[in-house]
C-alpha cells in the first residue's frame, strides 16, 4: 500500500508539483507488530482524525481520543467512522488535553503519544512535567525520517523541530537515537554525517569544530555505524561531490543515512526543502521519553502522520 496526499501548495517554479507519496515500507514493517494504543491529544479536527482513521483502517493502531467529544464525534461522522468501540476522554482546551494525553502514556495506558490540533509548545510542555510520568532521564530529541518515491533509502535529519541550539551533549544523544532508529529499521551499519558549511575545520566556524569533536566521540563510543564530519551538504548527499573533492574513500561522504545538524534553523531548512522542493515524505518522532512522541505539524498531511505512527510502532518494538 502506498499513501498519497494531494499537494495543495500554491505553485511556484521551485515547489514540487508531484503528489507526496509516503513509502509503504514503514507501514509494512509496523504491521508485523502488535497494534499500539495511540493517544491523540486534542483530537477533534480534520487531519489528526483522518490520520487516526486511516491508521485504524490499515489495522495499524488502536486510537484513544482526548479532547472535545462533540468535535471528535463530528469529525468521525464526516469520515463515516463509527468510533463507539474506542476510548474517548473529554478534555477542555489545549493545555488540559495535552496534560491528560501525556499522563495516559506516562502511566502505561498509551504506547504512542500523538499531537493533534494544538500548539507545539503547549504539547511539549505537558510531556516535560514530572507529573506526566514520561521523563526517563534522556534528553528529548526530534528526528525526521524522510523518504522519496524515487529512492528506497531514507535520510534522517536531527534535530529540526525541538532543540533550537543543541549542546554537544544533546547532539550526542541525537546521534545515538539516529543509529538506534536505523538499527530498528534493519540497517546494520548506518552512516552518520555531522553538518557544517565545510569539510575542513575552521577556527571561526563553531559547527565545523563541533563536528570534529562529535565524529571522534561517536567513532569511539558507538558501534555498528560510521561517522564523519565536518561535511557540507553537497558532500553528505552527492557521491560525485565527494569524488571531486577527494573524499571518495570517506565511508559517509556522498552516502549518508543521517544528518546531525548544528541548530534547528539548518535542520528545519533542510527538512522543509526535501518536503516542499523535492516532494519527500517526512515521518517525525521525538525520542527520549517513556513512549515515542509524534510532534507533527498541524498542516502535515494524514499520510505523513501515518508514516510517523508506523515509525513509532517499529521503535516501540525494537
Model-derived features: positions:
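Anion-binding alpha/beta catalytic cores of soluble intermediary-metabolism enzymes, centered on
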Residues: 2-252, 257-318
Amino acid at each position: 500500500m502506498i499513501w498519497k496526499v494531494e499537494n495543495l501548495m500554491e505553485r511556484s517554479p521551485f515547489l514540487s508539483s508531484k503528489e507526496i507519496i509516503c513509502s509503504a515500507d514503514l507501514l509494512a514493517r509496523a504491521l508485523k507488530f502488535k497494534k499500539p494504543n495511540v493517544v491523540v491529544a486534542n483530537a477533534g479536527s480534520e487531519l489528526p482524525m483522518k490520520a487516526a482513521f486511516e491508521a485504524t483502517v490499515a489495522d495499524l493502531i488502536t486510537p484513544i481520543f482526548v479532547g472535545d467529544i462533540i468535535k471528535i464525534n463530528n469529525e468521525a461522522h464526516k469520515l463515516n467512522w463509527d468510533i463507539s468501540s474506542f476510548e474517548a476522554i473529554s478534555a477542555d482546551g489545549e493545555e488540559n488535553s495535552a496534560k491528560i494525553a501525556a499522563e495516559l502514556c506516562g502511566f502505561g495506558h498509551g504506547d504512542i503519544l500523538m499531537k493533534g490540533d494544538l500548539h507545539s509548545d503547549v504539547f511539549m510542555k505537558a510531556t516535560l512535567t514530572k507529573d506526566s510520568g514520561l521523563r526517563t532521564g534522556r534528553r528529548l530529541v526530534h528526528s525526521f525520517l524522510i523518504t522519496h518515491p524515487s529512492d528506497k533509502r531514507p535520510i534522517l535529519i536531527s534535530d529540526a523541530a525541538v532543540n533550537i541550539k543543541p549542546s554537544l551533549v544533546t547532539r550526542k544523544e541525537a546521534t545515538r537515537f539516529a543509529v538506534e532508529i536505523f538499527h530498528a529499521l534493519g540497517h546494520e551499519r548506518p552512516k552518520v554525517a555531522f553538518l557544517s558549511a565545510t569539510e575542513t575545520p575552521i577556527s571561526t566556524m563553531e559547527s565545523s569544530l563541533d563536528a570534529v569533536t562529535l565524529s571522534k566521540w561517536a567513532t569511539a563510543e558507538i558501534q555498528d555505524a560510521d561517522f564523519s564530519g565536518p561535511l557540507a551538504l553537497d558532500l553528505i548527499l552527492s557521491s560525485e561531490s565527494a569524488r571531486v573533492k577527494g573524499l571518495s574513500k570517506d565511508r559517509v561522504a556522498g552516502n549518508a543515512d543521517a544528518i546531525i545538524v548544528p541548530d534547528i534553523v539548518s535542520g528545519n531548512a533542510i527538512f522543509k526543502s526535501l518536503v516542499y522542493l523535492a516532494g519527500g515524505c517526512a515521518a517525525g518522532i521525538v525520542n527520549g521519553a517513556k513512549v515515542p512522541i509524534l510532534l507533527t505539524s498541524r498542516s502535515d498531511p494524514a499520510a505523513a502522520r501515518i508514516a510517523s505512527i508506523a515509525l513509532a510502532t517499529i521503535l516501540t518494538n525494537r
